[in-house]
Amino acid sequence: MTVSPEQIDRIVSNQHHDPFEILGCHQIQQNGQSVWAVRAYLPNAERVSVLCPEQRQEYPMTPVHHPHFFECHIPVAELNNYQLKIYENGHERVIYDPYAFRSPKLTDFDIHLFAEGNHHRIYEKLGAHLLTVDGVEGVYFAVWAPNARNVSVIGDFNHWDGRKHQMARRGNGIWELFIPGLSVGERYKYEIKNQEGHIYEKSDPYGFYQEPRPKTASIVTDLNSYEWGDSDWLEKRRHTDPLNQPISVYEVHLGSWLHASMEDPPIGADGQPQEPVQAAELKPWARFLTYRELAAKLIPYVKELGYTHIELLPVAEHPFDGSWGYQVTGYYAPTSRYGSPHDFMYFVDQCHQNGIGVIVDWVPGHFPKDGHGLAFFDGTHLYEHADPRKGEHKEWGTLVFNYGRHEVRNFLVANALFWFDKYHIDGIRVDAVASMLYLDYGRKEGEWIPNEYGGRENLEAANFLRQVNHVIFSYFPGILSIAEESTAWPMVSWPTYMGGLGFNLKWNMGWMHDMLDYFSMDPWFRQFHHNNVTFSMWYHHSENFMLALSHDEVVHGKSHIIGKMPGDRWQKFANLRCLFAYMFTHPGKKTMFMGMEFAQWSEWNVWSDLEWHLLQYEPHQQIKRFFGDLNHLYRSQPALYSQDFKQEGFEWIDCSDNRHSVVSFIRWDKDYQDFVVVVCNFTPQPHSHYRIGVPEHGFYRELFNSDAREYGGSNMGNLGGKWADEWPYHQRRYSLDLCLPPLAVLILKLDREKTVAERARYNLQS
């Protein structure tokens, strides 16, 4: 016996922080000669021998001190790639010894960068990675658990027995092990023993793939083998400023957009039927569509309607459907509800090849308490604050990340980068930013701790957000980083070098509330609330705002958008058209939730899919046609998007006609030669001679009329356009005498070609 009984006992009881010191091969002196001592701890093994392929020799191993701790001595100069022949339960198997492969992947520099919070691609080091060491293929595992006594890899390959693959501790509390012979598809977890001896089974925080809920094991996968076809899209994105482009976002929850029958199994990339994932307990006959099926159905739908981007409610792995994805346990794993990581890559790839960008909701503000997740990860408060006054959201029943800890911050910063790097996404929308920025968010007096200056601002969270945005824009110019921030925190969408948080867009929650309040009231009373319509332009240029009517506005008893509108059925649809036409002509990028485009009546229900049957009825067909035309018009007119965030891009014609509840304004293109005129009538009262001032003489073509017959309107309008009169109005030399339809928006544009032709004809006649 060349090792002490105490050391063997530590291995047997799984209490050794570095099993490589005992197990594997070690050169020793025996009778004045150098020999190799090979040791192995193999629970359940009846007998074991060492195979040396180079010498074509087999060396029996002997139990030492413990019936399953084996050792043998091999008198050779070099011992490479030896194998263990194991007899157990009447079966024989041959494996490479994991403890013959020391430190194959993680360097001291990796550990240093991680410890200071600056290893931007730590996901290429921690987690589970296919690796070939000395010609032997296997999987390398690494996990950060600094306060653990021991960590093991468990899985189907070792019958979930933590004694068989004990990991070795490296610097800064990182544990690692290379297991030969494993490959893609292996299920695994980490068995973590804390200092008191309690054992926790945890999914891999850096795992790329997990089992469908309710199972929780991580799955080994290879993210680098997918062949992308979107290089042209990525190259164009890199050289494009998205703030000067049209952005019209269709917000989607993939699990409730459309369901399929459980009797119709999905077909995988290999052409074989796959196991369907049931959509909800209350709908046992329904299943989720896969990422590939969604690519075939959702992308053409979005493309037809003219949206520029799809925004996905969180697709990172989460255990509870009812959280909508906002309680994440697998930050590096697209949810397996809809397929594999390669399937999600295919979805994004197909979006790009069809000219559609992909934004994903990202949730760095909190995480759930599920036992297999990040909570109490190594037996201590590792990812979360230990003090519940900083580490818990009681309102949501979730935990708050410790943004002041370098390794936790690194986990999140690298995660944001990961989705751009590995999945080619085009943007993130950061959820619940206000809950991160304020220490007293959702807390009563005495339930929170002030910052070092005595204030309520979470300085660590603010610095974290700056770091995230600085990093992702450094690697991927041309992307979007959108903040859902509901307070007046300054400079949210300003660059970090100017003192901002570094986002390039912020949801305009004030505009959303003002508009929904305004449009939900009886039109007669709108004259007394005219400020709801005009107020947003007083502060619009303080941030880069995105106008969003999101999923949050169609749940929890709020009714869907069409249900918020007053009046009879005709007026409800007219109000809806008026609201969205105003939204698409107001400065700012656009986001709207699924179902709004065809006026779904029922609230969004995560357990069901959309009310597609409504499209058999003409009013819903007409509103869908309205949205398609509105989107395509928006994208075709640079004046409606190219100067969203410059004061010169917007000009009121008249914002003071509260008596009629009418506003009119001009949107200018960046060269100030092209412009559109917008007139909004927010009451059911039409106006046959409504005059507005315009900047130039000529024929103004009616590009869009939300009251058109094809949209279900009354078809009032201006017969295709109007000539401007040389009649000064609104401090302008020329004016238009318009017919304003009820509850409608008109978009007009100077037709320079017709104007020049008419002038030439007039001069010729003269």
From Swiss-Prot:
Q: Which InterPro entries match?
A: A-amylase/branching_C (IPR006048), Branching_enzy (IPR037439), GlgB (IPR006407), GlgB_N (IPR054169), GlgB_N_E_set_prok (IPR044143), Glyco_hydro_13_cat_dom (IPR006047), Glyco_hydro_13_N (IPR004193), Glyco_hydro_b (IPR013780)
Q: Which domain of life is it from?
A: Bacteria
Q: Which GO terms describe its molecular function?
A: 1,4-alpha-glucan branching enzyme activity; cation binding; hydrolase activity, hydrolyzing O-glycosyl compounds
Known catalysed reaction(s)?
Answer: Transfers a segment of a (1->4)-alpha-D-glucan chain to a primary hydroxy group in a similar glucan chain
One GO cellular-component annotation of the UniProt record comes to: cytosol
Keywords assigned: Carbohydrate metabolism, Glycogen biosynthesis, Glycogen metabolism, Glycosyltransferase, Transferase
What does the record give as the active site? D431 (nucleophile), E484 (proton donor)
User: SUPFAM superfamilies under this entry?
Assistant: (Trans)glycosidases, E set domains, Glycosyl hydrolase domain
EC number(s) per UniProt? 2.4.1.18
Q: Which GO terms describe its biological process?
A: glycogen biosynthetic process
Pathway noted in the entry: Glycan biosynthesis; glycogen biosynthesis
Function, in words? Catalyzes the formation of the alpha-1,6-glucosidic linkages in glycogen by scission of a 1,4-alpha-linked oligosaccharide from growing alpha-1,4-glucan chains and the subsequent attachment of the oligosaccharide to the alpha-1,6 position.
Q: List the HAMAP family.
A: GlgB
Return the similarity comment.
Belongs to the glycosyl hydrolase 13 family. GlgB subfamily.
Question: How does it associate, per the subunit comment?
Answer: Monomer.
Name the UniProt record assigns to this protein: 1,4-alpha-glucan branching enzyme GlgB
Gene that encodes the chain? glgB
